[in-house]
Amino acid sequence: LYKPDTHEIILHNKNFKTDEELVYTAVHEYTHHLIAEEQLAINGSAYMPNAKVHTEAFWVKFHSLLKIAEEKNYYSINIDSVPELKELTENIQKNYLEANGKLMQEFGRLLSKAHALCEKANIRYEDYLDRVLCLPRNSARDIKRVGQISDIDPAIGFDNMKMISTIKKSDERAKAQEQILSGESPVTVRSLMKQKCQTPDDPKQKLEKEKNRLAKTIAQLQQRLDYVEETLASM
């Protein structure tokens, strides 16, 4: 448990069977502390803890700290020590993640073919998706995009294939794919992808954007409050 108001980390040792579990949880709570400290440095005393604490930024920092803990031999996730789990993991990776990735690649190619045939027959492809295949359009778009890119390794699994297929440059796709194959978490890879696409805001611009966003939200809430009060008054 992390208490942002007092900056305290509380660990109950009876909740853990091994040191590995204790270290994992300690790193988790320490990540909350670091995120809170960063926000305090940016926003000062005006900082208020967000209700949503497990953000993408949190998981990226958490996984980076876990890597440091592994490098220093404080923590490890050693599935080799559990033969049954190792065998099951290999089965999942080969016969489910990779097999499903291959299947979805082929699915994407078939959707491209169906799109072309719909256009040839003067049939709206969107209607074909909606009422013949009953497939959500966003899902069809993602699957089709995966099928159009041949240099993605199905071994990373379909969800990661979808993410990497949004990268336009093949060399950057290859780098992102290699990161996943080497054990980087998808959320870390996604964050790195975003960093390359975005120019960092300076602190003032960031606060101005937040101010505008909050002002808009307050205006909408005030409008709703006025409506509710008027409705109550007329009852």
Where in this protein do the model-derived segments appear?
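Active-site recognition of the HExxH zinc-binding catalytic motif
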Residues: Y24-E37
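Short pre-active-site segment immediately N-terminal to the catalytic Zn-binding motif
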Residues: I9-A26
